[in-house]
């Protein structure tokens, strides 16, 4: 095992800082330049910005879908109110005609009409 302790003096005899690769060759550790770290930070920042943009897009899409459903509900309600309005107008005309027929058939309203015509 690497990093074995010498029993004679208690010090390490072999310390390897590199991992062995799959093919048995030692892997060499390399330090990254400041430019590479900057590039990595930009990539991380870009990934975070992309994630924020994606979340914002998802939120907006959900909001649009909710508004579309609300609009559909309102449109259906408007159609129902229009239909009810037409029905009530029709009933109002029938009632108006009925009242007019009653008034013309009643002698009370006929005498009032003739008195008002005389004046």
Swiss-Prot record:
> Which parts of the chain span the membrane according to its record?
none
Keywords in UniProt for this one?
Coiled coil, Cytoplasm, Golgi apparatus, Membrane
User: Where does the record place it?
Assistant: Golgi apparatus membrane; Golgi apparatus, trans-Golgi network; Cytoplasm, Cytosol
Q: What is this protein called?
A: Short coiled-coil protein A
Region ranges (Disordered): 1-26
Compositional bias (Acidic residues) spans?
A: 1-10
Which is a Gene Ontology cellular component entry for this protein? Golgi membrane
Q: Which InterPro entries match?
A: SCOC
| Regions annotated as coiled coil | 48-95
GO terms (BP aspect): positive regulation of macroautophagy; regulation of protein complex stability
Q: Which Pfam family, any one, appears in the UniProt record?
A: DUF2205
What protein family is recorded? Answer: Belongs to the SCOC family.
Note the topology in the membrane. Peripheral membrane protein
**Free-text function comment from the UniProt entry:** Positive regulator of amino acid starvation-induced autophagy.
